Amino acid sequence: GILGMNAGPYNEVIKFKARDFSMMRYLKRHYPAEMAYIQPPKPSTDGLSTINSLIPMLKKVENEYVKYYTKTFTSLLTSKEVVTGLTKFLRHKKGDNLIGWNMLEQVKPDGKIGSETLAAMPILNQSSNEENLICILQCALCCNKYSVDINGIYNDAVVKVVQEFQQNVGLTSDPMVVSGEVNRRTWAALLQSKGDPDRKANACDCTEKLDLIKAKALKEAGYNFVGRYLSNASDSNKGITKEELDIITTAGLNVFAIYQEGSITPEYFSEEQGKTDAVKAFEAARVSKIPNHEVIYFGVGYDFTEQGCREKVIPYFSGIVKAMKDKGSWYKVGIYAPRNICNIIIGAKLAESLFIADKSTAYSGNLGYALPDNWAFDQYETETMTGNGTKFQFNKVIASGVYAGFNGLTRCGHENYRDCTLHD
């Protein structure tokens, strides 16, 4: 959209193009110094939808702009310029009057936003009259697939869209968030995949086995769900057991199951490997007495391009689905991966539930991509818990409520009840 930041593969925002290009022309004319900060994006085909699909909309704009944008059009939703472009412009528009508003210095090369910038992010609501900042907010909403006019006015329509965004990214229960108002929580969620790392989590995942002290400490800290791994990698002892599941249940937590062993290089992924991993995950789930019909999230720990995802990850998940079907479809297939990979796999109908790996803000599959719809879990920051005689590390996660996980008392298979202790 505006600032040369086109919405790429999302057809829903194609309708914004003519308006955004007109806004670009307006900004160049009235704010030449500020616009000098924004460089035309480098051509790329990664995540790029076909330019021909945009031509009808582009024809509504003056000829010189059509020519310019058809030459430079790219999907910045897969580019590291997306955050730096918006934040540089935002800092320059805001000026140096706001102490600590160090956008240029605080935005890291990997797309992370520094703590000083987070602390200095402005509050915007219907009483705000800072047209320039509201324009940037509206632009950021467009880049996240939300339809809003870019006019610098914080009207009822903007309030409604902000509320919808806050709901969809899991901010509504945060005590720091005011519905329809934008502060650091909402700004961060708009500008980087992990959002504000300081926000409170209601779930977590960890590779470390939990004893009762650790599990109770998590519950007392407000965590209700914990992601645990089904099996042990060659150099680890991270696999959940039936005994640990009972301990977690006693502490009042629910579990969601993760399977990930060697999936951190592109060479790992193939249809045959998917079949192998599905069988291993199935067998581990049976041994640990995981109830029937629960989700197993298969991890993708590599930053694939869209092309790489189609060449490697789709065959991998095709193998998983085939093997699970051969085993009787006792478990649902989920995916644990960056945003764009999740979108591609769910679009190919190869997974039923999404665990978003948003912590890696520098991943090309995260930076600039909107949070997928109907996500179940969103991982965003690493935390270390100390106290009660224990110290351990885990990842902070937001649970949307789409999937509640399970515990040792969950009816196996739900309506198709079968005692999970009878698993072979």
Over which residues does each language-model region extend?
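Aromatic-lined carbohydrate-recognition surfaces of secreted/lumenal glycan-active proteins
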Residues: K325-I344
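Substrate-binding cleft of extracellular glycoside hydrolase catalytic domains
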Residues: G1, K209, D235-G308
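Acidic (Asp/Glu)-rich catalytic clusters
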Residues: R19-P32, K214-G222, K238-A257, E283-P291, ...
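Loop/turn elements at helix/coil->beta-strand transitions in domains of secreted/extracellular proteins
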Residues: P32-M35, G95, C143-N144, A221-V226, ...
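Functionally critical loop-and-helix segments that line ligand-binding/catalytic clefts
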Residues: G4-S44, R199-C206, C342-D424
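Active-site cleft segment of glycoside hydrolase catalytic domains centered on the general acid/base Glu
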Residues: D303-G328
